[in-house]
Regions:
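Short glycine/acidic-enriched loop and turn motifs that connect beta-strands
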Residues: 370-375, 421-431
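Sec-type signal peptide cleavage vicinity
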Residues: 10-266, 326-347, 354-388, 400-410, ...
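Sec-dependent bacterial lipoprotein signal peptides
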Residues: 1-8
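A short loop-to-beta-strand structural motif that recurs across blades of beta-propeller domains
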Residues: 378-380, 435-438
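Surface-exposed binding patches on compact interaction domains or structured appendages
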Residues: 267-268, 277-320
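Beta-propeller fold detector
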Residues: 388-397, 447-455
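Repeated scaffold domains used in trafficking and secretory/extracellular systems
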Residues: 399-410, 456-478
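Short loop/turn segments that connect beta-strands within beta-propeller blades
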Residues: 383-386, 441-445
Length: 486
């Protein structure tokens, strides 16, 4: 029995919440984990998989988590030091969330081939005890049994992923169980990845029914109207991926995906073209570009070369390429460079990128004054490729700079702005600008400081010299502590 297909529920290190319930009594509940039907990716084969308790499993009752089971097997007892109410109790098996709030992570882990960690990967079960505190657990999540094998590939497997072509389907995320099923997902994703660590695991030379090689947890969802992508990633950078028809995933059911991983038929990887791939792509600090891709078969030794300090995430499993500069300027980063992707030394993709950085020596600012009674000022920027970027201050800071923009000065990684009327028009109407004096980061245009300070001139009058409100017009900064305003 123990050498059979053991989909054992293994726990994470979720600690019992001390003192969550007061005024209760000591209770011990005994549970049996019910078996589920195993199906292949095609037809149901009718075999059953016993789900076994692990020694460190716990359950939830009335918002309180039990002590660990202590023993592994088909039955286990769970103790509560303080539990309110009387049996029957509603029981939840949930090692990644709390009570009825289930959490299936998009990134799951398995330490070794055949050593399943379903509990730590989001396995969820429920039951109602009888009057004596006994219960049989029903499983509400679904399970993907990965059954890969190869007689050609020696590289070690570091991860396997399942993704739906329809990206609106949530295989993972956070959902609340209502007794009959799960509610809508928050933080959901259309893919799950099961990782085996940096060293990976060896592939078996053949598939088989006597042992589950690897298994991931997903929510029961209907994938029958879409395709699914199964992707195996290896330690040397090689990838094997295949597309299959989807199907409806039922609660408590296990779906077997058998894959012969072979190099014979080769493979293909194609990244979606941009609007003008012969032109460099401009990205903003904190922004990103995401391209779709198609992939199938054996793709050997994929390598990505990205600009310094940039992120280039080629995720073949999720069929995406995400490129992003850092959120802030970092010393030594490349402002312009080329992203290259190759397979087995052969080029697959090349694209020039640059980050919109306002310190570039070939950039040009145009200050738009606005109107003193109706419109705040704005800034237009022409970058080194003569591309026009309008309202750059507003886009970064979610507000306008001020009324009647007069002047700017750049020094020491800062930009200093002066506006004539600040937050109001010349007639006193509020226009909600940031102020008369504004300082921004010169690389990103992010606002550092805004003040609506008034400026006064000493003006002679019939009653003598007195300070009179005036309009600032020009600014020169000479250091972080000193500047001149006309």
């Amino acid at each position: 029995f123990l050498c059979g297909l053991l989909l054992a529920a293994c726990s994470s290190e979720f600690e019992e919440e001390a003192g969550a319930v007061r005024g209760g009594r000591a209770v011990e509940l005994t549970g049996v984990s019910g078996s589920s039907t195993r199906t292949s990716a095609g037809a149901v084969d009718g075999a059953a998989i016993p789900f076994l308790w692990s020694a460190d499993d716990r359950i939830w009752v009335n918002g309180v988590q039990s002590s660990e089971a202590g023993t592994a097997g088909a039955a286990a007892s769970f103790g509560f030091s303080e539990l309110t109410g009387e049996a029957p109790y509603e029981v939840y098996y949930n090692m990644t969330g709390e009570g009825a709030r289930a959490v299936v992570p998009s990134r799951q882990n398995q330490a070794a081939a055949g050593e399943l960690q379903l509990g730590a990967n989001g396995d969820f079960g429920y039951a109602t005890t009888d009057a004596g505190g006994h219960f049989t657990l029903s499983h509400a999540t679904s399970y993907i049994w990965f059954d890969p094998w190869s007689q050609e590939v020696d590289a070690r497997l570091v991860s396997v992923s399942l993704a739906t072509a329809d990206r609106t389907i949530a295989l993972c995320g956070t959902r609340t169980f209502d007794g009959g099923g799960f509610g809508a997902a928050t933080g959901g994703e259309y893919a799950v990845t099961l990782s085996f660590g940096a060293e990976g695991v060896a592939l078996p030379a053949s598939g088989g029914d006597t042992r589950v090689f690897a298994a991931a947890v997903v929510y029961p969802v209907d994938c029958s109207a879409t395709e699914v992508h199964v992707t195996y990633t290896f330690a040397d950078g090689s990838v094997y991926t295949e597309t299959r028809p989807g199907r409806k995933l039922e609660a408590g059911a296990t779906y077997r995906l058998t894959s012969e991983i072979t190099k014979r038929a080769g493979g293909a990887l194609e990244i979606e073209a941009g609007e003008a791939d012969d032109e460099p792509v401009c990205l903003k600090y904190g922004g990103s570009e995401v391209r779709s891709l198609t992939a199938e078969g054996w793709i050997p030794q994929v390598r990505t070369t990205a600009p310094a300090r940039w992120t280039a995430d080629l995720d073949i499993a999720r069929r995406t390429l995400r490129v992003a500069p850092p959120a802030e300027y970092l010393e030594g980063q490349d402002l312009e460079n080329t992203l290259r992707i190759e397979s087995d030394g052969e080029p697959l993709f090349s694209q020039d990128y640059y980050v919109l950085d306002f310190t570039h020596p070939e950039g040009t600012f145009v200050l738009m004054e606005g109107n003193m009674t109706t419109e705040n000022g704005s800034i237009v920027y022409f970058d080194q490729h003569m591309r026009c970027h309008e309202r750059v201050y507003e886009e970064v800071n979610d507000n306008e700079i001020g009324n009647v923009l007069q002047d700017m000065y750049m020094i020491g990684g800062r930009i200093y702005f002066i506006t004539q009327n600040g937050r109001t028009s010349s007639t006193g109407t509020t226009l909600n600008g940031d102020g008369r004096f504004v300082i921004c980061d010169a690389h990103t245009m992010k606002r550092i400081l805004a003040r609506d300070m008034p400026f006064y001139a000493q003006v002679a009058s019939s009653s003598g010299v007195k300070p009179t409100l005036c309009w600032p017009q020009h600014i020169v900064a000479v250091s972080p502590e000193k500047g001149y305003i006309q």
